[in-house]
Amino acid sequence: MVLKTSQKAGSFLLALVMLLSLTSVFCFKSASAATDGEWKYELENGGVTITGFIGTSRTISVPSKVNGQRVKKVTALNNNNTKASVTTVSFANGIEEIGTGVCKGYISLERVALPDTLVTIGSDAFFNCSSLTGITIPNSVTTIGTNAFNGCIALISADLSCKATVIPDGLFTGCKSLTTAALPSYTTDIGVAAFSGCSSLASINIPDTVKTIAKDAFNGCASLKRISLSTELKTIGEMAFKDCTGLTEIFIPNKVKTISEEAFSGCTSLQNAYIGSSVSVIKKYIFSGCTALKNIVFGGDYYNFTDLSSTAVTGTYTYYPSKYADGWSHYDVVNMKSYSAPTSVAISGTTEAAPGAKVTLKVTATPAGGEFNNVYVLKSSNPNVAYISDDGTIIARATGITTITAYTVSGASASVTFSVTPDKPQNLTATAKTTTSAELTWKEIPNVTGYNIYRSTSKNGTFKKVGSATTNSYTDKGLSKGKTYYYKVACYVNSDGKQALSAYSSVVSVKAAAPAPAQISAKKA
């Protein structure tokens, strides 16, 4: 029995040793932290995650590979005092994620180069990089974390032409040197204090996809004189534009439902506020401290005037559509007047332009004679093709097609298609190939989708499209022998399912006939 017990004990100890051995091996494999030159890294998810930089260079170039493995993620760089001296950080193509706080507190960092493969920028990634002057977010980025550039006090410009739909909380809070910011065309939400304290921000284009502007989003943007709000906007948060002391006018679009507390309080230069017909909830103190406010013009028939009354300013007049006069008579808000609200609007003028051209469209509201018929906003569906300047001028930027829409405070609107057209084809020639075909050639136009070819049987007759080409030549077949044909060509760019068509080339003619035979010489035998 004693022998058997000893055998059992020995077997148990042997099994325990083997288990501990396997466990230690397993633990070693899971703890894959390693170093390769200046880089600390871990292997995970089929790639490398860089967890630290142990070099001393002031210029850091994060590689695409470490120890032969592709770098996918960076979670940390300098974790010591040398980070204060780093001036440049570049991330190689292939990197998909920059983690939380990677460059936080790099106070000497002046330049950052982000890769075209980047998808995610973590929270606080460049927090308090107080020497950074500019940033371009690649198109590939879909997610930006909160406070990513918070406290970058030297930042002048930010290009966020990426796929992110949310501008996160605190993204540029305290970036007091920021003058311009291009938001993603996919943006739906602008987060809490996203641009709070950006006191040099002079202009910003809010895409028409934005539905929510959160609390304090633009609080303290003292240089903003005018802002064009999204036509899809539904909610303006508390103190969203508080202390925007340069703002002189605001137009609330016709899908906004709620304007929250103190939304425009402290806007000491604000003179006119136009509030769209869709607004049904107006919270307290939205115009508190707006000492220059002259007119509040409503476009609709219902507002919470009890809350609005607490924002009354001496000398301010409130206007409402005359058809709702009886409904407002019992409210004691501020000086009230009625006006003839536009019921329709029309746009006229040139709707084609070359890149770089400036165009002014005429907007006419009816019935004529309304006090605010000249108050409207213009919007471009594709600002990359043409955008609207602060004075309402349309600036043609690149070939394509956009829709220009005019909106009035009462909700009336009208749209026109606006084309930015390429240069017309030059040096068109036509040569008879056979008795039934002709070859056309012309000078190639760069950056166009293709060319349309038009034919007529008389120079001043009706031209009909006979074909298209993607190169600068075309052979027209099926002609009648001995007949003269006239041709012209236009080039085009595809845009939003339509063609932005250039002006026509000059007209050329050709007679369908076999080309003359080559001269033949022969010697007498």
Language model region names:
Residues 22-37:
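Sec-dependent signal peptide cleavage junction
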Residues 476-497:
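Beta-strand-rich modules
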Residues 100-102, 123-125, 145-150, 168-173, ...:
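Consensus positions within tandem repeat domains that build extended binding/scaffold surfaces
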Residues 9, 23, 43-45, 55-72, ...:
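Structural signature of tandem-repeat unit edges
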